[in-house]
């Protein structure tokens, strides 16, 4: 179902009481059909279709990441612990670039992301690497 911008400027009323505006609720159908008791419009809180959220599409790379099938402690070692195993796994991962891009965009401060430690990512952001 497509919506026009004017579709969400209506106010929802129930028994002549103001319930609020639907300006930010595209999933609420205030159409006149079907009607409920006493001919009042029936509200539906269920959308006609489900769209994949943009964030979900962007994060689908995580399902293909090799680290998803590995012990997370390798990627989040204790202070002073070795990061060698995690970096080795990252080298063969098909989503390494997407992982690093995500970590840089979301300012991930802990763990190995895209084959780089937090310190290495900071240096990369500053242009040192």
Swiss-Prot record:
Assembly behavior: Oligomeric in native gel electrophoresis.
Predominant subcellular localization, coarse grouping: cytoplasm
Protein name, entry field: Transcriptional regulator WhiB2
Gene from which this protein is expressed: whmD
One annotated GO molecular function: 4 iron, 4 sulfur cluster binding
Organism expressing this protein natively: Mycolicibacterium smegmatis
Gene Ontology CC, one term: cytoplasm
Resulting phenotype, residue 93 to A: Required to complement filamentous phenotype in depletion experiments
SS bond partners: none
């Amino acid at each position: 179902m497509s919506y026009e911008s004017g579709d969400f400027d209506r106010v929802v009323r129930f028994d002549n009481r103001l319930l609020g505006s639907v300006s930010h609720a595209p999933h609420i159908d205030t159409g006149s059909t079907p009607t409920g008791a006493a001919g009042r419009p029936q509200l539906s809180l269920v959308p006609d279709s489900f769209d994949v959220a943009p964030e979900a599409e962007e994060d689908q790379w995580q399902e293909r990441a090799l680290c998803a099938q590995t012990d997370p402690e390798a990627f989040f070692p204790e202070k002073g612990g070795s990061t060698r195993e995690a970096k080795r796994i990252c080298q063969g991962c098909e989503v390494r670039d997407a992982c690093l891009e995500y970590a840089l965009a979301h300012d991930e401060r802990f763990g190995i992301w895209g084959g780089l430690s937090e310190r290495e990512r900071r240096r990369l952001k500053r242009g040192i690497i």
